Amino acid sequence: MKELGLKKNLSQFILLVIVNAFVGGMVGIERTIIPQFASENFNLSSKSAILTFIVAFGITKALTNFAFGKLANSFGRKNLLIIGWIFAIPIPIILINANLWGWVIFANILLGINQGLTWSSTVNMKIDLVGEKDRGFAMGLNEFSGYLAVGVTAYLSGFLANKYGVTPYPFYLGFLIALIGLILTVFFVKETEPFVKIESKTDDSKSIENIFIETTFKNKTLSSVTQAGLINNLNDGMIWGLLPILLFSMNLDNEQIGIIAAAYPTFWGIGQLFTGKMSDFYSKKKMLFWGM
């Protein structure tokens, strides 16, 4: 008999925390080395041209996140997590062998699908396991593991690029991350949909007919939360795209860029350890206000 709760499902919960660290690791690979990669391999120096890979990633991830809810109900969370990892496998191979910038953009479209499916899967699966009581804590641990891994791999990719060159060794790390994530998911992660059915028996809340319209325009509270999330992700995109370009133009080496690029997601992740649990008993509106 399956039961909701963190203690009752601790082993699966910890496993999903580990899996999400690998999810974060995939996106962290590009946080440091792209300016030099673009300059050396494609003779790109234009900021607007270089940043096209982030635009491709962001749009694809947004669309994948939007579709995730219905896809999860149809195919199951674990299956989507597996599919997300399958999309990750060719990314490092494409980047190693890319001879046109278009291939880099294509690789980041795949990365957007990967992140949309895997990150959404892991956070929802954790929430499924713990139930209503510890949702904030589950979310906090998910973000902690993911963003801490972004920081770690941002530094590691810079270190590898500085020691062995911008390609291929940093991307070998990406391939290893994707492979381990896929193996862990296929053989050890369990589907959490049965836990959703358990919680739905005691949940009398009404379903929303058009979630996009309701959360973006109609419901003022949800609309403001959505806008805050948009601003937060825009900030992240600017740090990801512009900071390494600025540091590269200042003639810092990749390891130095990696240290600076790693600081932001690392401290973001560490902060989630505290703010996640806070949201279970403290006003989320006040937390959002002070955060903004």
Could you describe each region identified by the protein language model?
Residues 1-10, 191-227:
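Juxtamembrane intracellular "pre-TM" segments in multi-pass secondary transporters
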Residues 57-66, 150-151, 265-273:
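Residue-level signature of mid-helix packing/kink "hotspots" within the transmembrane helices
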Residues 64-76, 161, 272-283:
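Helix-to-loop junctions at the C-terminal end of transmembrane segments
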